[in-house]
């Protein structure tokens, strides 16, 4: 996994009823990561933000041309898109659950965070190639990776 692991781990725990942590503090961190691009590699290494977030928000997926500098694999745009979409879904569910719990957190419906995250949660669809039915690399122009392009493999 190459995305934002804290959101899926903390969100899953909270939804399942594990509450031995400060969910408000956790939510602050999860929201910061979901909406912030790290300015430097050092910030990313220290767990701040999502890499390639600007492309993810601009296109609704991370295009193949957007290789992530200093990543273990520079060709992980599809995996990163899928994980970010999953993380956005999990965070939206946490916000919705907080809305109906005794735990305090600002109303996500009023701030638009829930709706924004649910829109982003559907971005996984943008890397599903309708002609193959598989998640596949996609270029910034909207075209999908072809067999001829497979000499340079993307995940």
Listing of model-derived features with the role each one plays in the protein:
Residues 92, 98-155:
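Catalytic cores of carbohydrate-active enzymes
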Residues 1-98, 118:
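Aromatic-rich carbohydrate-recognition surfaces in CAZymes
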